[in-house]
């Protein structure tokens, strides 16, 4: 049984930065779970991401908003994108292709 919607808030940066999981694998992992996805992108400039990076080498040049959009757009239609105040974070509503 699949869910109607997956809510992935404050998740991607942990998987990508702390877990070294590439964005394409994250998108592929989430895609079969539900028709719709609400997902948050947390930029490298965010304090939480800086904490994840403080004790490791920054090898995450591909972890950008532009790459995130491009990679997820290959698996989803981006229905809505909303900047979260002045945080640099973005929320996306997506529909599986």
Question: Predicted segment positions?
Answer:
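Short secondary-structure boundary/capping segments
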Residues: 52-58
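Short alpha-helix
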Residues: 58-76
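Core SAM-dependent methyltransferase catalytic element
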Residues: 79-97
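Hydrophobic adenine-recognition pocket in adenosine-nucleotide-binding enzymes
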Residues: 11
């Amino acid at each position: 049984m699949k869910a109607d919607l997956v809510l992935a808030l404050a998740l991607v940066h942990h998987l990508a930065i702390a877990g070294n999981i590439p964005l394409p694998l994250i998108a592929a992992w989430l895609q079969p779970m539900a028709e719709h996805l609400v997902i948050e992108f947390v930029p490298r400039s965010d304090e939480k991401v800086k904490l994840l990076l403080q004790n490791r080498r920054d090898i995450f040049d591909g972890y950008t908003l532009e790459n995130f959009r491009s990679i997820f757009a290959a698996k989803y239609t981006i229905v809505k994108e909303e900047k979260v105040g002045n945080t640099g974070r973005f929320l996306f509503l997506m529909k599986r292709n």
